[in-house]
């Protein structure tokens, strides 16, 4: 079962690239972030033409997440079910069950600056993700895969130059501790199960030739419950999709599991 996460940074701007990539790579489940469109504008028909069902949770010019599947799309749910009465104000998470695997497509808030309200929102959001998983899944027995743009580099290996990011978001102790809380539920960052070295990134700024200078961060993550993680065959960042004309600033992360 091939599960992919990809922040496309505007699906409207990159739909042709996404279609070509799907045709070439044949994911079973493709989770998109930053679609930047309303639900009414989402091109379900174009994915149907490729043999995929799709679900979308969007709001317009910002945010937006989707799950696109050729192996079934059931129990679709946007937002959190964590027992709180306040819904997430942004379109940032979409859940679906695909061939028996519970999948979440996540676009974690950026945080902006450490002293900004958006940073506090980010930490709260990650806490809500933890609480939703704790309340609605059993990671010890259920195949669950949580993917997306987490806007957090799990450790210093995931940042091209850690000293350049001191005091900035994406690398702070509270953000990283929020990811560790997910791991405390039993979830595994499957990329780090296969690759230990530094310098393997999934995002590069458009400016200053950052991609070709390898000045990036690994913030697009795949977390798997024990059942799913034990079935991992391989995981890879598709750097080639960051090349060419009008790419996203993120590359797809492809994870293959022996689950179907």
Describe the role of every protein-language-model region:
Residues 9, 36, 107-109, 151-153, ...:
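Catalytic metal-binding/acid-base residues of hydrolase active sites
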Residues 28-29, 143-145, 221:
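Short, Asp-centered acidic motifs that coordinate Mg2+ and/or phosphate
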Residues 1-56, 62-65, 154:
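N-terminal, active-site-proximal structural segment of metallo-dependent hydrolase catalytic domains
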Residues 142-156:
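Acidic/histidine-rich, metal-coordinating catalytic segments
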Residues 1-10, 100-115, 147, 250:
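Active-site-proximal beta-strand elements of phosphoester/diester hydrolases
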Residues 35-38, 42-113:
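Structured beta-strand-rich core segments of catalytic domains in phosphoester-bond hydrolases
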Residues 81-84, 108-127, 163-167:
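Surface-exposed cleft-lining segments at the edges of enzyme active sites
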Residues 39, 48, 76-81, 155-260:
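Metal-dependent phosphoester-hydrolase catalytic domains
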């Amino acid at each position: 079962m091939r599960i992919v996460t990809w922040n496309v940074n505007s699906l409207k701007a990159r739909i042709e690239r996404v279609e070509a990539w799907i045709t070439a790579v044949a994911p079973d489940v493709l989770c998109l972030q930053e679609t930047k469109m309303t639900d009414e504008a989402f091109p379900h028909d174009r994915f149907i033409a490729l043999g995929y069902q799709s679900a979308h949770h969007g709001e317009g010019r910002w945010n937006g997440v989707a799950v696109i599947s050729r192996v079934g799309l059931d129990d679709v749910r946007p937002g959190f079910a964590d027992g709180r009465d306040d819904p997430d104000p942004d379109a940032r998470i979409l859940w679906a069950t695909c061939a028996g695997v519970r999948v979440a497509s996540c676009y974690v808030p950026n945080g902006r600056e450490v002293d900004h309200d958006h940073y506090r929102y980010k930490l709260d959001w990650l806490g809500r993700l933890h609480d939703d998983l704790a309340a609605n899944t059993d990671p010890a027995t259920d195949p669950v895969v949580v993917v997306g743009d987490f806007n957090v580099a799990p450790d210093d290996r995931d940042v091209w130059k850690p000293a350049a990011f001191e005091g900035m978001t994406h690398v702070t102790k509270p953000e990283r501790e929020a990811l560790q809380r997910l791991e405390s539920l039993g979830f595994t960052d499957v990329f780090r199960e296969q690759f230990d070295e530094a310098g393997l990134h999934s995002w590069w700024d458009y400016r200053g030739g950052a991609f070709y200078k390898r000045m990036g961060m690994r913030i697009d993550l795949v977390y798997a419950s024990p059942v799913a993680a034990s079935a991992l065959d391989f995981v890879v960042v598709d750097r080639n999709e960051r090349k060419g004309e009008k790419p996203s600033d993120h590359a797809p992360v492809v994870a293959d599991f022996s689950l179907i």
